[in-house]
Amino acid sequence: MALFKKKNYIRINPNRAHANDASKKPSVPDNMWAKCPSCKRTLYTKEMGAEKICPHCGYSFRIGAWERLAITVDEKSFHNWDSELVTKDPLNFPGYLEKIEKMQEKTGLDEAVLTGEATIEGQAVAIGIMDANFIMGSMGTIVGEKITRLFERATEKHLPVVIFTASGGARMQEGIFSLMQMAKISAALQRHNKAGLLYLTVLTDPTTGGVTASFAMDGDIILAEPQSLIGFAGRRVIEQTIRQELPDDFQKAEFLLEHGFVDQIVPRNLLRQRLSDLLRLHSLEGWR
């Protein structure tokens, strides 16, 4: 009878089908998309290139020290200095050394600054690059020691110094030992200056606190990346102190340029060439 005739269908286990669908679901790699803090557009990260610049508004995303090094100096010209220095915990601050280890694994750096010797379009230079990804680029004893030695070696070798700043200020976990670095670096910087050698600073986002109050603003020529946050105290602290509302662009690179604190704002994709031009202009070869 037709009633008992085998029907033309197959049985589907809904749980198994769901599991198969989940296994076939494409995985999206991390860091494929980013949102621009300036124009608020969602960007495909490959659009930004190695310089990590928004193609729509020109905003420069924060980049690490190794990324910065790769787009600034000549290939295979960098020689790392003082990577053997080890961070101590003078105040026995809870969890401090564990945090240092975690940051070292995350960034591939030994501390919040990378220092060494390299060439930029064939011109020898002592270079320091701070990394805000390493405890906000805060300045502790090792950061201070590495930058001090950078200036001392540059003075001995008669090299110009280029430093890319990116910092939240002094490292609170080291207390007064951190604050001491400001004076120590400034003394080495002054000896480099008395030797008649060039010092260029590039202020990047963010450059604040004790770094701003010491070597960041002491450059013979001070460059900055567009829209970088540059200042000493925080905006809220200043407003509460002076009891006035600050302009919207206060502590931005453009505001500082307008008020004479910065010599020039240079887009990241033009920085390498601008540094090369300045180094050549201030070298002996530049006067021949």
UniProtKB/Swiss-Prot annotation:
Organism per entry: Enterococcus faecalis (strain ATCC 700802 / V583)
Reaction it catalyzes: N(6)-carboxybiotinyl-L-lysyl-[protein] + acetyl-CoA = N(6)-biotinyl-L-lysyl-[protein] + malonyl-CoA
GO cellular component: acetyl-CoA carboxylase complex
Protein name as catalogued: Acetyl-coenzyme A carboxylase carboxyl transferase subunit beta
Domain of life: Bacteria
Record note on cofactor: Binds 1 zinc ion per subunit.
Function: Component of the acetyl coenzyme A carboxylase (ACC) complex. Biotin carboxylase (BC) catalyzes the carboxylation of biotin on its carrier protein (BCCP) and then the CO(2) group is transferred by the transcarboxylase to acetyl-CoA to form malonyl-CoA.
Protein family: Belongs to the AccD/PCCB family.
Cofactors: Zn(2+)
PROSITE patterns: COA_CT_NTER (PS50980)
Positions of C4-type zinc fingers: 36-57
